[in-house]
């Protein structure tokens, strides 16, 4: 629903911009090859383990394709609004952890997992897809350079197999992006772009599907995520 509302709002903005005068409008459409580097600081709290927490830092690098459409107007200093979409961003690396939480076993100093016996393999897996961006662009004079800022959303599909039988729900990731780039001409109607952006994602949080028998709490995972993206694009203008 959030994505639908965002798309409707963007389309409405496009229509409002279009009434400024057909002769001043320029429409663009194209495809992009993107490279992204992301950093995450995650914390997982296990149920029925005296609040046992696991902290982990991770760095991710991935590449993906996207498509975009834009409209801009000379009557508002060349200000443009656009929408880009990438159906698949990254398949997260699958990780298997051996868990042996025997009754009364001391997990960390002074932390005993009394009453817990979740022994087995914990499989961590997932993917990020449906990356949607709604953004504004503003040219820097006639230099070909431009500034960019916008809103982003993606879906983190979780596919974890926890020893406790609990599962995490999928997470809607939202955030903002800022950056800039350079646009060059390829003939009369084609163009190319080189662009760099920084994405600031809102903090992520998800709870497990099953409550613990001892405390009634649930597994919980929290994460802070940031990313940078470089893009090369080609497109047509009308």
List each model region and its residues:
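Predominantly the C-terminal beta-signal and adjacent terminal strand-loop region
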Residues: 53, 86-91, 102-106, 111, ...
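Short glycine/proline- and aromatic-enriched beta-strand/turn motifs that initiate or cap beta-hairpins
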Residues: 21-89, 104, 143, 153, ...
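Detector for outer-membrane/organellar transmembrane beta-barrel domains
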Residues: 78-90, 97-154
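Cleavable N-terminal export/targeting peptides
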Residues: 1-28, 238
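Outer-membrane beta-barrel translocator domains and adjoining extracellular loop/strand segments
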Residues: 39-53, 91-102, 152-172, 204-215
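Outer-membrane beta-barrel strand-turn architecture
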Residues: 71-77, 128, 139-144, 184-188, ...
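Membrane-embedded beta-strand positions of outer-membrane beta-barrel proteins
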Residues: 29-33, 81-83, 136, 147-149, ...
């Amino acid at each position: 629903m959030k994505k639908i509302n965002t798309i409707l709002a963007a389309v409405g903005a496009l229509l409002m911009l279009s009434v400024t005068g057909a002769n001043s409008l320029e429409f663009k459409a194209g495809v992009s090859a993107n490279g992204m580097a992301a950093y995450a600081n995650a914390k997982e709290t296990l149920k029925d383990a005296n609040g046992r927490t696991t902290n982990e830092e991770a760095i991710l690098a991935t590449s993906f394709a996207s498509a975009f459409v834009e409209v801009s107007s000379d009557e508002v200093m060349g200000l443009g609004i656009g929408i880009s979409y990438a159906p698949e961003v990254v398949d997260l690396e699958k990780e298997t952890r051996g868990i042996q939480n025997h009754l009364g076993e001391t997990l960390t100093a002074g932390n005993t997992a009394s009453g817990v016996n979740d022994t087995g393999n914990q499989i961590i897996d997932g993917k990020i897809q449906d990356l949607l961006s709604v953004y504004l662009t503003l040219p820097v004079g006639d230099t070909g350079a431009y500034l960019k800022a916008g809103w982003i959303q993606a879906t983190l599909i979780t596919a974890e197999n926890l020893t406790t039988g609990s599962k995490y729900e999928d997470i809607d990731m939202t955030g903002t992006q800022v950056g800039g780039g350079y646009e060059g001409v390829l003939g009369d109607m084609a163009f190319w772009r080189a662009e760099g952006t920084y994405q600031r994602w809102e903090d992520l949080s998800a709870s497990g599907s099953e409550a613990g028998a001892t405390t009634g709490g649930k597994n919980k995972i929290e994460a802070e995520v940031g990313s940078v993206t470089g893009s090369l694009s080609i497109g047509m203008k009308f």
